[in-house]
């Protein structure tokens, strides 16, 4: 059987319409789905990212950057909305890939989505832990250092006078008491004549708050999707209220002079050469790329398709509605932030504090002075409460992808078990929750964060190309929602996502390829042999490709991805060897995807049976093991020698 055999769309639609005690409970409305999306998208990072993008890249034009990032996100959201309304099944990008790009690609995407949902939930849990510890400190409660963070994380106890002295420089933000030790803190202590060794130092052994919130969210999701949605809705109302309160309290104290110049002149280096991405229009575009990650999360709505009451109507509402709400809020936040304080003052760890302080000074003697004085505490409370809703959506998404993969035979049958009373995929929810809790307790947030970003963007690329291919292979399938200006919008979505992927550090790419290589071994060892496609008839296997149509668009899209990658790295000012390594590893992924798309669109007429060939399983397993061994060797060389030979890792 071809590795690119697709699951019949008609069969997927039929499965989505099944009812009974062993299926997921349909209880979500369009409003529930919208709140799920908002809960996944809005995080505390928006305040930090806005300040950094304004100070380093776009200036006051960060407002335009925010709009551009929203538009780029909308391109991907349109693709998800079309798929979710056409194929309303809980597998998200996995199910869409199965219907268009074939089983092997679908498995890779399903495996990749673990990076987005499970790792994403763990990242949020670690961030939640930090806010809880800080929140408790405001009430005079010091959480034990040994239970604050991942094992080996160092904390230093700073006296109030030293903390105040460090905060005056506004290059880092510290609290009196225990703070995490990092290079920036060491450097700032050196500047004032101190070192870490001058103060008490302790190491953490376990992140207890992160572990506990993961357990709580897991139990909530086992209880029921409607109960989880109601909890999420209440939390989202609190979270958005905090954002709206900042906008309302600050908008009356905007200084219009802070908007001039709206797009600051482009910076130049010591030789007078313009610096790309530092103000000017290039800075506006770079700012949009930085801010884009604040919009990630809307795709999680698609994992709840089989629990929506009317998925064909409500899925596009949930996906696009949540993105629209967040875009409006984000644009207003950026407008207020750069309006109340000069963008030159926002290159600090807590830019929101600078904006609030500037507005509070202007508000002295007014009703808003007390509100603005309380805003740091309110935002911290909003973060503690709000990150809980993000975790709910992330932990909700992963079990439903496992559920779909199990229903297709790619995972064991027990992974698709539904609780007889709550009608939730309780087995995979508990497993996901356990994985998230363990990672939250033992893994550092910096390692988790970038893996989440690259996993999400890779899924965006696949879904964008999948929309084009499905338009070609299944032109007659009913589409309640259609991506406008196809294939232009899907191709632009794939290019934008690939551009942002290419900009992530090379060590993150190495981890992605290693993760995918492990997934390939599992596929050939188990999933290929147990796939339910093997039990379909040869008639169902036949691919009905319209005569006289040549699928040019998907191939053009992949060619543009390859050209974009080459342009991004082949002509940089990096050393020659670094350019070769940077370009080659990224091209490996895109060329592999291109080969799959080519054979899918031009070679599928050869597929007449879904029968399993044991030789394919054996050869595939051997090849995947060799591939994994090779990439382990490459990764070992990379981490041992790359920084030494080329001056650091991207």
Show which residues each predicted segment covers:
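Membrane-interface "cap" regions at the ends of multi-pass membrane proteins
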Residues: 1-51, 55-60, 73-78, 87-90, ...
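Extracellular loop-to-transmembrane helix junctions
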Residues: 25, 49-160, 205, 244, ...
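Loop-to-transmembrane helix boundary motifs in multi-pass membrane proteins
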Residues: 30, 153-155, 163-165, 171, ...
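Membrane-helix boundary/coupling elements in multi-pass transport proteins
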Residues: 89, 112-130, 290, 295-308, ...
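TM-loop-TM module centered on a large, flexible mid-protein loop between adjacent transmembrane helices
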Residues: 95, 102, 133-148, 265-279, ...
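Hydrophobic alpha-helical segments and their helix-loop junctions in multi-pass secondary transporters
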Residues: 130-142, 237-269, 334-341, 460-477, ...
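C-terminal membrane-solvent junction of multi-pass transporters and transport-like membrane proteins
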Residues: 202-205, 414-424, 460-509, 520-562, ...
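Membrane-interface loop-to-helix entry segments
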Residues: 205-256, 319-323, 449-462, 489, ...
